[in-house]
Structures are given as C-alpha cells and as structure tokens.
C-alpha cells in the first residue's frame, strides 16, 4: 500500500489593526517608538523633523523628497532612507502558506507459518512562520513466526528520526514584534 498526501495551512483570521496613525506619541512622529499614537500616516511627508516636504536637518543634508519621509532604520540598513508614507500589513505579510507533504508505504504478507509487515513513512512540513518546519522519517518492521504448535516468536522494531525547526517562545518570540509593529513601520523591508 502506498499513500501520499499534501496539505496547505494559512492563518484563518487576523486581528484588525489601525492603519491611520504612524508610530510615535501625542501626535508626534518618532521612528523608534513602538506606539501608534503619532501623526496621520498620510501626513508623514509634512513632519517637521522627518518629512521630505519640510525644511529639516535631513532635507538640508539630502535635499527635499516631496511626498516622502526619512526613516533612520532604513539608512542604518544600507537602504534608501526615504519612504513614501503608507500603512503596512506587517502581520499578513509575515506569514507564509504552510505546506505539509506526507508519504508512506506498507508491505505486509501472511504466510503458512508466520507473517511480516514493513512500513516506511516521511513527513516534510514548512510552517506558516518563516524558518519553521519539520522533517520526520519513520520505519517499522514486525515479524512473527510459528515455530511449533506451542511456540511462536516475533519481532517488532521502530525507528523515528525527527528534525524540528521552530521559533523561540516566551520573551524571545517573534510574534510580539510582528503583531506589535506600528502600521507605518515596514517590518519586512528592513
């Protein structure tokens, strides 16, 4: 007998995130703030400290960038530091479609004085969280022999090898960063 299966996993529901206000506090933009109480995202190009439409230290150094704003994290990453204001869907963009492939084979036979069964299987899974997944291989051999009317013997052996790639949990988990990232911050672009 040979069996195979393929399945796909996706995040079923996502929370609704506000996509109107940029990171910051009390209406002021702060590129290092994790709160989303800054100015309207649509007004970032007019921000007095970071806006590409205004006179500030960045536009004095690099020239005006109409319709954009300066993002220090992008500059530190070696990317173009000027970004067009928009709301990002960081949580949706973070997750992958998970794929799981299962396959197995089984050979079994019953004889006059015994029986045997050999099963082989494998599972390869790529998780919905990037860099997570599992590879699993298993084998099972069962044999039984009737040596005489009153005496039988048997053997049963199992082998399983698993390699699991998982995300860290608790305080080091990535999910707090993904769900907590402000909508104005491009988590995937830095």
Language-model segments: residues:
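Outer-membrane beta-barrel initiation region
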Residues: 93-98, 105-111
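Outer-membrane beta-barrel architecture
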Residues: 106-108, 119, 142
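Residue-level signature of outer-membrane beta-barrel architecture
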Residues: 109-111, 122, 145, 157
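Residue-level detector of the transmembrane beta-barrel scaffold of outer-membrane proteins
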Residues: 115-119, 152-154
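Transmembrane beta-strand segments that form the barrel wall of outer-membrane beta-barrel proteins
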Residues: 120-126
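Surface-exposed loop/interface segments of Gram-negative outer-membrane beta-barrel transport/assembly proteins
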Residues: 3-86, 97, 127-132, 138-190
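Short coil turns and loop connectors of transmembrane beta-barrels in diderm outer membranes
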Residues: 112-113, 149
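N-terminal periplasmic accessory domains that precede
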Residues: 1-4, 105
């Amino acid at each position: 007998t040979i069996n195979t299966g393929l399945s796909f996993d996706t995040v079923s529901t996502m929370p609704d995130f506000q996509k109107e206000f940029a990171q910051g506090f009390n209406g002021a933009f702060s590129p290092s703030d994790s709160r989303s109480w800054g100015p309207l995202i649509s007004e970032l190009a007019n921000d007095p400290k970071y806006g590409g439409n205004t006179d500030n230290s960045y536009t004095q150094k690099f020239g005006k960038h109409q319709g954009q704003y300066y993002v220090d994290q992008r500059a530190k990453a070696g990317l173009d530091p000027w970004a067009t204001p928009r709301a990002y869907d960081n949580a949706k963009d973070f997750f992958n479609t998970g794929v799981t492939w299962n396959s197995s084979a089984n050979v079994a036979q019953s004889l006059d004085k015994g029986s045997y069964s050999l099963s082989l299987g494998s599972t390869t899974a790529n998780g919905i969280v990037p860099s997570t997944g599992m590879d699993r291989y298993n084998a099972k051999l069962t044999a039984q022999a009737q040596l005489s009317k009153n005496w039988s013997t048997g053997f049963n052996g199992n082998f399983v090898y698993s390699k699991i790639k998982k995300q860290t949990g608790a305080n080091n988990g990535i999910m707090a960063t993904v769900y907590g990232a402000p909508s104005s911050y491009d988590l995937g672009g830095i």
